[in-house]
Amino acid sequence: MIVDISKKPDVFRYARASANADVKKCNTAVAAKAATVASRYLPFLHPLPLSATAWCKDGKFYVEGIAHWQTGVEMDVLFGVLVGLLGSGAVKIENLRVEIKQKQTTPPIIENVNTSEAPITREGDLVASAYGRMKVVNLDIVKNPVEKGHPIYAAQTAAALNAKRLCELLGGPCPSVQHFKIEIITSDSVEVRTFIKARDITPAPEALFSAGVALLTIWDMIKKYEKDENGQYPYTYISELHLD
């Protein structure tokens, strides 16, 4: 279910997300663009008129966004960081988190940053697998249906669909996926493993992307339970996402 926001007022919504990764290039243009279209890939997000920018500094990748709208933009900028780092060639991402989110009646000031774009380089075998782990406050909620549906089932479906769509965001050829599977485990955290086999080019970025989408889908579905009294997410983050 996509939550009804029709009675909410339009206010300025701002969020900044970041993650750590060792990359030689920063595909910030792809990150900013991905944030603006996140609702096409994360199934329960509302389309919104997001303005986004991205930059790299001291081993961290940042995306921030603002919209005058009825719902928050934190999931959109998280998605932007994920796609931006994959477009930058990252094979290991750590501490993907929301640094801050705000709701206010006056527009926040965001800096104009020159974004850059670089073609993705695909290297690897025709079989790829990825692992991701997300820390959450309310692990039991992940295991049962919530207002939007069942987090695990929705995440499995979103991952499978998005395993074939990363090339829309990064450009270049799309792997001809022959097999995909996903496993989601809830123990002391939310763990995801994906496996992809392709016919022609390596699906390594797709393995990472589908695992990341699964975790972000779960986060989006339970986010109302993860916020603290100030509406922030101090204890919810994707601690690791990497190729196996």
Swiss-Prot record:
Pfam families to which the protein is assigned, alphabetical: MoaC
Gene Ontology molecular function: cyclic pyranopterin monophosphate synthase activity
Biological or metabolic pathway of the protein: Cofactor biosynthesis; molybdopterin biosynthesis
Keyword DNA damage assigned: no
Catalytic reaction annotation: (8S)-3',8-cyclo-7,8-dihydroguanosine 5'-triphosphate = cyclic pyranopterin phosphate + diphosphate
Enzyme Commission numbers on file: 4.6.1.17
UniProt superkingdom: Archaea
Single GO BP term: Mo-molybdopterin cofactor biosynthetic process
Top enzyme class: lyase
Active site: D220
Keywords: Lyase, Molybdenum cofactor biosynthesis
Family stated for the protein in its record: Belongs to the MoaC family.
Complexes and interactors: Homohexamer; trimer of dimers.
Role: Catalyzes the conversion of (8S)-3',8-cyclo-7,8-dihydroguanosine 5'-triphosphate to cyclic pyranopterin monophosphate (cPMP).
Protein name: Probable cyclic pyranopterin monophosphate synthase
Origin organism lineage: Archaea, Thermoproteota, Thermoprotei, Thermoproteales, Thermoproteaceae
Gene name in the database record: moaC
